[in-house]
């Protein structure tokens, strides 16, 4: 099915811009780490598109762990899903015991999706990407820290990527790119309700 490939190609402007900015600010066109949230995967596909074949770049995809990946209330498709069909293409899908698509759960509407793009499934299957699950509380905590220290209100989707940072280890010289997509002002009620 062409839809996932079309989305990835159109969103590739993200990684094209990353290449330009990294060359300008770092003197090279690639980071050591790329970190992106992943639901259906448009933001993540665009973030990694130009770097899939560059083995110097470590790719980290962050799923919505909801109330915990073992709680039955998450959208952690790569952690808990299995191969299936959704929207006309084969990929990893959250399914019940009979193979029916299962309702996902995430505090973030943008990550509340029962499937994953085929590119992301391939990156996970081949080990090209590391997969991290971040639960609702971790995402909100990370978002509130960004607000406190930098004055940036991230969207709930990107807050999951931020929530992965304490779970990863970097060297001081590493160039780390984490994509913040969306606008957090639309999520302000969720953030205020978490206090």
Can you name each region flagged by the protein language model?
Residues 30-43, 59-62, 175-180:
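A short, small-residue-rich loop immediately preceding and capping a beta-strand
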Residues 4, 11, 15-17, 42-49:
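Conserved PLP-enzyme active-site core in the AAT-like
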Residues 147-179:
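C-terminal structured "cap/appendage" subdomains that terminate the fold
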Residues 13-25, 161, 167:
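Phosphate/ATP-binding catalytic cores across multiple sugar-kinase/actin-like superfamilies
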Residues 37-48, 69-71, 158-165, 185-188:
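Short glycine/serine/threonine-rich phosphate/pyrophosphate-binding segments
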Residues 1-6, 12-14, 25-28, 53-56, ...:
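Active-site/ligand-binding loops adjacent to catalytic centers
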Residues 24-37, 46, 50-54:
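Glycine-rich cofactor phosphate-binding loops and adjacent beta1-alpha1 units
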Residues 8-13, 172, 180-195:
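Glycine/aspartate-rich loop-and-adjacent alpha/beta segment that forms the canonical ThDP
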């Amino acid at each position: 099915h062409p839809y996932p490939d079309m989305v990835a190609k159109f969103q590739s402007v993200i990684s094209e811009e990353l290449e330009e900015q990294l060359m300008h600010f770092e003197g090279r066109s690639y980071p050591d780490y790329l970190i992106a949230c992943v639901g259906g995967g448009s933001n993540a596909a665009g973030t990694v598109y130009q770097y899939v074949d560059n083995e110097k770049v470590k790719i980290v995809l962050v799923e919505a762990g909801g109330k915990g990946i073992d709680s039955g209330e998450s959208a952690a498709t790569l952690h808990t899903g299995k191969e299936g069909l959704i929207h006309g293409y084969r990929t990893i899908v959250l399914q019940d015991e009979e193979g029916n698509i299962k309702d996902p759960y995430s505090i973030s509407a943008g990550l509340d999706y029962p499937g994953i793009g085929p590119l992301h499934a391939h990156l996970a299957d081949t080990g090209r990407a590391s997969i991290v699950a971040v639960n609702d509380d971790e995402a909100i905590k990370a978002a509130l820290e960004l607000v406190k220290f930098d004055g940036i209100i991230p969207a709930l989707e990107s807050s999951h990527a931020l929530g992965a940072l304490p779970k990863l280890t970097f060297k001081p010289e590493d160039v780390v790119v984490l994509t913040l997509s969306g606008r957090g002002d639309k999520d302000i009620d969720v953030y205020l309700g978490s206090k």
